[in-house]
A protein has these predicted regions:
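N-terminal subdomain of nucleotide-sugar transferases
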Residues: 1-45, 62, 66-68
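Acidic-and-aromatic substrate-binding clefts and catalytic sites of carbohydrate-active enzymes
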Residues: 78-84, 109-115, 158-161
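Alpha-helix capping/helix-boundary segments
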Residues: 137-139
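Membrane-proximal helix-turn-helix segments that form the acceptor-binding/catalytic region
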Residues: 87-98, 114-130
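Short N-terminal targeting/anchoring amphipathic segment
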Residues: 11, 49-54, 60-83, 98, ...
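P-loop/Walker A phosphate-binding loop and immediately adjacent motor/lid segment at beta-alpha junctions
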Residues: 85, 91-97, 145-157
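Acidic anion/phosphate-binding donor-loop and adjacent secondary structure
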Residues: 144, 154-172
Length: 175
């Protein structure tokens, strides 16, 4: 029996609190997430900067096809044309790599209208090997609007366990 290696995931992004909390704090020997490559048009030397994501280009996929097994898109595609996303999906398909989409936003609050985001989602939803979303309500919208069956994985906590478990003061306010 041959030795197995971890599944190598190119996440968009990798260095984001949501993505970091998808794995146990001690790590998961069955999955390795690639570090975020330097962003396109980088204006910072900050290693935590991941946007705009280079992974979402056909060129990056072609140059790094041997470095990963699966792509996982969370967000970061809001500045891309739908045609660029099609080219990216074509490059993944040519390389034999599927991608998973986590549909976080059904409406992008940074866009003045819904048109561009819906066109982007249309491309990604039609090409993804699997779609994940965070709530049953979002899954229903994805099914009604795009005919997509999505798995629901509720949002993981994004604060440290110590903070999450600390006692809270009683109060009458609403947060």
């Amino acid at each position: 029996m041959g030795e197995t290696r971890p599944i190598r995931v190119a996440s968009v992004p990798t260095n984001h609190v949501y993505v970091r909390h998808l794995s146990p704090p001690e790590g998961d020997p069955t999955i390795t997430r690639l570090p975020d490559p330097p962003p396109l048009r980088a204006t910072s030397t900050d290693q935590s900067q991941w946007w705009p994501p280079a992974i979402l280009t056909a060129e990056w996929v072609r140059e790094h096809a041997d470095d990963f097994d699966l792509a996982h898109v969370h967000f970061g595609f809001d500045a891309l044309d739908p045609e660029d996303l099609e080219a990216w999906a074509d490059a993944l398909e040519a390389a034999g790599h599927p991608f998973v989409l986590t549909a976080h936003d059904l409406r992008n609050p940074h866009h003045p209208t819904a048109d561009l985001h819906e066109a982007q989602l249309g491309v990604l939803l039609s090409r993804a090997a699997h779609v994940i979303t965070l709530s049953e309500a979002a899954a229903e919208v994805l099914n009604e609007r795009w005919g997509v069956e999505a798995s629901v994985l509720p949002h993981p906590h994004v604060v440290d366990e110590d903070w999450l478990e600390r006692p809270r003061l009683e109060h009458d306010g609403f947060v």
